[in-house]
């Protein structure tokens, strides 16, 4: 477990610039690679919670239109391969060829895909991958209703990178839902610094040259682990 005050936090501009640099010709990552690594980290977090005694078997992954949603779709495929029962909730038809490839992978893994609101209480765990660090208010259709559902549900929630609707720098400024769990990707965002739930981090791939260039304080993963729990001590 790593202390929260011994790690770098990113604001919105830094988060966006860092993604761009990772996928630059010089650094060489592709969006496919980054989503695969992120999705596996999300799934590994669920596995870790189950190892501790939770019974998160039937899981709904709520996915938005951006990279956060793509991470969620990939996580569903990994969860299925891990023997769990994920389902995906999208809230509009997907026209992006890249996303459709990810969805086809899930269809071939027999993962149910929904395009309408679901009864959240019939699931053991919800994965919130609706909106990411690029979100700017106000909430718009069709994502306003599922995010309101997350505020009232009794089913535990694992948010991806930042809870949907939160400001990447100011946090839950508009009083949206607060999840029980959070998995930050690469480095945590400023807006989750005061998060009180269980906070994990994944995305163990920050190149050493970029760590030095930006003077990042990065997570101290153990052995071959791909996730790490952060402590607020």
Curated annotation (Swiss-Prot):
It holds the Pfam family YjeF_N. Residues 15-218 form the YjeF N-terminal domain. One of its GO terms (cellular component) is mitochondrion. Its EC number is 5.1.99.6. Binds 1 potassium ion per subunit. It comes from the Eukaryota. It catalyses: (6R)-NADHX = (6S)-NADHX; (6R)-NADPHX = (6S)-NADPHX. K(+) binds at residues 68, 128, 164. (6S)-NADPHX binds at residues 67-71, 132-138, 143, 161. Its cofactor is K(+). GO terms for molecular function: metal ion binding; NAD(P)HX epimerase activity; nucleotide binding. Transmembrane segments: none annotated. HAMAP family: NADHX_epimerase (MF_01966). NCBIfam families: yjeF_nterm (TIGR00197). This is NAD(P)H-hydrate epimerase. It comes from Paramecium tetraurelia.
């Amino acid at each position: 477990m790593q202390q929260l005050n011994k790690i770098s936090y990113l604001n919105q501009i830094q988060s966006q610039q860092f993604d761009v640099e990772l996928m630059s010709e010089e650094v060489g990552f592709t969006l496919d690679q980054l989503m695969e690594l992120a999705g596996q980290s999300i799934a590994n977090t669920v596995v870790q919670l189950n190892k501790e005694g939770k019974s998160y078997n039937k899981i709904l992954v709520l996915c938005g239109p951006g990279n956060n949603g793509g991470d969620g779709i990939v996580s569903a495929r990994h969860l299925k391969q891990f023997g769990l029962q994920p389902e995906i909730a999208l809230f509009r038809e997907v026209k992006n060829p890249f996303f459709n490839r990810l969805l086809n992978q899930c269809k071939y893994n027999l993962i149910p895909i929904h395009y309408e609101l679901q009864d959240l209480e019939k699931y053991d765990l919800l994965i919130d991958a609706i909106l990411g660090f690029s979100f700017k208010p106000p909430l718009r259709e069709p994502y306003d209703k599922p995010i309101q559902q997350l505020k009232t549900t009794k089913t535990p929630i694992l948010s991806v990178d930042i809870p949907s609707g939160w400001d990447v720098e100011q946090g839950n400024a508009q009083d949206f839902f607060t999840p029980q769990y959070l998995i930050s990707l690469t480095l945590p965002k400023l807006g989750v610094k005061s998060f009180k739930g269980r906070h994990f981090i994944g995305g163990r791939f920050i190149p050493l040259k970029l760590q030095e260039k930006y003077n990042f304080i990065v997570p101290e993963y153990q052995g071959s682990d791909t996730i790490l729990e952060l402590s607020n001590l």
